[in-house]
């Protein structure tokens, strides 16, 4: 590693290639111009230094946009140590730029599972000893789980966790229910300016981009099956429809299924009469035999299971835009079928057996990103303007929890404060306003009479917590 581009003597990092730092810095500067909410918070709070004294363990995709988030946290007074939450999602030039700025980061694209866990451990440890961290910023919950299982003593100093994604929120809620969560958390995922931007509009932008980069296929006129119609599924379905695909949706939630119908998508099930009894006989082979592309979007396990994979049309593309690779039964694929790497993060999965394959045989599936996040494995993820809302939420959530000083409270008070909550709506609206300003939009202010008539403050919040946007 070159020491030329980093502060003298700084070695507290591991990235693929530190010489990529200048490239990364150029991209960071462009990203800043596309992240008005995040940069607005940086300007607004720089003088107050609300995160002075905060020591943040971060585990989120090490992209260019994350670089802007990291430098915003630092600009507001925090110290950070960073790793990526996915083995394929790091942009190496982004990691290099952050390392060159003297910020500890441990991430590179194409980590093994062992290297991934090692990188997380390096953020937790400094000079071989647990760092005196007092905040956690997580995406997916792996960092949170490692802290609870291997370093529980560190939780005594930690004021809280901010969690970015659906999967991580599910894990936090399970921990809270089971009595194993030791510190409060903010569910950033369900902030409106996160879920409606990142999950929906971000996937609308980045899914088709990733599939086209990975396969060079024309998508129009082909049939796609999107598994799940939550916010991610909604954006994904729109993304494929934009390409001219014939999109079908599979859902378990009647409300989401109804929304898919109302949006003009045919709601189908890969199982006969919607019943999965675990046998091949329960599969709707006639349906799956016509599907050219299957996308999982749920955050649940085995929603594209082994029997579905057996029944899929030859040469169908299979990918996931949820969080972990267990949405698709990749374990079955590894155990029973031969894998042929076409290029990084693109594999032909030969269904003719495990021990070998005929390269000219056409009974294969094309698996993208090994079943992990396709938009970050095969492309660069959501654009900066989308991540602006998500990361502005993260900054405000970190400030909010850090100000609460949970770790300093008496035991009785801690018991009352232990929860998983969404960011207060007023802060959500603050993020939204900065985003609107970034588009050059002008928001109309209520008159006092109008505000009184609908029972809100002129300054907001403007909707009750029960309002569904």
UniProtKB/Swiss-Prot annotation:
It catalyses: S-adenosyl-L-homocysteine + H2O = L-homocysteine + adenosine. Substrate binds at residues 63, 139, 164, 194, 198. InterPro entries: Adenosylhomocyst_ase-like_sf, Adenosylhomocysteinase-like, Ado_hCys_hydrolase_NAD-bd, NAD(P)-bd_dom_sf, S-Ado-L-homoCys_hydrolase_CS. It is found in: Cytoplasm. One of its GO terms (molecular function) is adenosylhomocysteinase activity. Belongs to the adenosylhomocysteinase family. This is Adenosylhomocysteinase. It comes from Pseudomonas aeruginosa (strain ATCC 15692 / DSM 22644 / CIP 104116 / JCM 14847 / LMG 12228 / 1C / PRS 101 / PAO1).
């Amino acid at each position: 590693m070159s020491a030329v581009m980093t502060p003298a003597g700084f070695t507290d990092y591991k990235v693929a290639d530190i010489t990529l730092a200048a490239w990364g810095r150029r991209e960071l500067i462009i990203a800043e111009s596309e992240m008005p909410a995040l940069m607005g918070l940086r300007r607004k709070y720089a003088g107050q230094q609300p995160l002075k004294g905060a020591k943040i363990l971060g585990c989120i995709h090490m992209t260019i946009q994350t670089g802007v988030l990291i430098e915003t946290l630092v600009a507001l007074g925090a110290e950070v140590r960073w790793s990526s939450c996915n083995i394929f999602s790091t942009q190496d030039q982004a990691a290099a730029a952050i390392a060159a700025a003297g910020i500890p980061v441990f991430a590179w694209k194409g980590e093994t599972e062992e290297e991934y866990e090692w990188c997380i451990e390096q953020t937790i440890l400094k000079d071989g000893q647990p760092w005196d961290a007092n905040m956690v910023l997580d995406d997916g919950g792996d960092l949170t789980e490692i802290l609870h299982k291997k370093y529980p003593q560190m939780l005594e100093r930690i004021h809280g966790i901010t969690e970015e994604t659906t999967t991580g929120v599910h894990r936090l809620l399970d921990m809270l229910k089971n009595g194993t969560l030791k510190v409060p958390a903010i569910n950033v995922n369900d902030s409106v300016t996160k879920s409606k931007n990142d999950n929906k509009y971000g996937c609308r932008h980045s899914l088709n981009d990733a599939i086209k980069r990975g396969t060079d296929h024309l998508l129009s006129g082909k049939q796609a099956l999107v598994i799940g119609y939550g916010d991610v599924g909604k954006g994904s379905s729109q993304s494929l429809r934009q390409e001219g695909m014939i999109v079908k949706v599979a859902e378990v939630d009647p409300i989401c299924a109804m929304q898919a119908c109302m949006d003009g998508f045919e709601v189908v099930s890969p199982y006969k009469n919607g019943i999965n009894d675990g046998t091949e006989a329960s599969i709707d082979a006639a349906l799956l035999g016509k599907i050219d592309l299957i996308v999982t979007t749920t955050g649940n396990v085995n929603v594209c299971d082994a029997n579905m994979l057996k029944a899929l049309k030859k040469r169908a593309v299979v990918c996931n835009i949820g969080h972990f690779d267990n949405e698709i039964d990749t374990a079955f694929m590894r155990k029973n079928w031969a894998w042929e790497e076409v290029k990084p993060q693109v594999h032909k999965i030969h269904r003719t057996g495990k021990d070998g394959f005929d390269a000219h045989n056409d009974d294969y599936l094309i698996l993208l990103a090994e079943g992990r996040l396709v938009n970050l494995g095969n492309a660069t993820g959501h654009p900066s303007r989308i991540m602006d809302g998500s990361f502005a939420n993260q900054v405000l959530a970190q400030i909010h929890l850090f100000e609460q000083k949970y770790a300093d409270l008496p035991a009785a008070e801690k018991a009352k404060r232990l929860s998983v909550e969404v960011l207060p709506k007023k802060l959500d609206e603050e993020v939204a306003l900065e985003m609107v300003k970034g588009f050059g939009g002008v928001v109309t202010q209520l008159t006092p009479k109008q505000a009184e008539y609908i029972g809100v403050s002129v300054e907001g919040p403007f909707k009750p917590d029960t309002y569904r946007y």
